[in-house]
Curated annotation (Swiss-Prot):
pH dependence statement: Optimum pH is 10.0.
Protein name: Pyruvate synthase subunit PorA
Gene3D superfamilies for this protein: 3.40.50.920, 3.40.50.970
GO biological processes: response to oxidative stress
Pfam families, per the entry: PFOR_II, POR_N
Amino acid sequence: MVLKVISANQAVAEAAKLAKPKVIPVYPITPQTSISEYLAKYVADGELDAEYIRVESEHSAMSACVGASGAGVRVFTATSSQGLALMHEIVYAAAGLRNPIVMANANRALSAPLSIWNDQQDSIAERDSGWMQIYAESGQEALDSVLLSYRVSEDRDVLLPSMVCLDGFILTHTVEPVDIPSQDEVDTFLPEFQPQAVLDPDEPMSLGTFTDPNYYMEARYEVERAMERSRKVIAKACQEFSEMFRREYGFVEDYRCEDAEIILVAMGSVCSTLREVIDDMRDEGKPVGLLKVRIHRPFPAEEIKKAVSNAHKIAVLDKNITFSVGGALHTELKALLPDKEVYGFIVGLGGRDITPEHIMEIVRKTENPERTVSWIGLKEESQ
């Protein structure tokens, strides 16, 4: 391994290079752009043997990914916000066609109003598309998640695309030390892609043909079954990754939850801030813990239940809004934990800072609740 001080975007690009994709269709968009720039440089400099396609839009990027994956090669792309929204039509097609594409998404708010700053609305809008979703907390986790995603997506029992999500600017442009595995290590962990069905003119077949009501429902059921099968594949891949690279990952990560009366639940980079504040609260005698949801799809229901089993109250921080019912993760936990008091907090939309004071406010509101869903960090005149 080599330790480099790099941004999370460069970490993602390094991971993609190590995975040796053969086709990389990308359209640049802030704050993802430097991922595509690094990959273009790797290809131009001869460090990566791949076809780098400069497409005219994100819709075309995902379309090219689907075509290349259908032709039997490993594929990578990256996008953000409006770019992911433009891909929406083909995002669903990729899952239905069982293309094991890996895509990095630099989480950014959706327009309108136009914003280039972070929240997680873009990827949450695709949570039901059939893609697996991982939310990274650090540059190291972003790099590792790309490698793990290929390992899981390409498994014959899964064959579903993966989206590695990293918070725009907060993570994408933050520079920190990242351990980069050697090519030999990655080649051992991630063997060459062995496609199951390939578009080959010498052996013609059809993929994604018109389907009438006699077959469509079964096709969607197969995606659901693959998503369920991915749980065991993910667990095995994480175990083997830990043995090889000495970094442990799972569906969730709990911190000081054993005796916690209140557990804060979140995804992404905010978890680093939450740990610091929780330590301060513990020093003051407040029994608070953190549950980081790392893998959002497949949804880690049993892991969440186990982690929060001893807590009385759950506070869910969502960087998204599902209008009229709160945030997406909050609605899922509220349905999952009917015997718990589950409160939702909308935070950080459009890049609004989530400060230690905001986190302490969330704990206070959970201790003495006035409503099920609260917005944190709003300007006073808006409240």
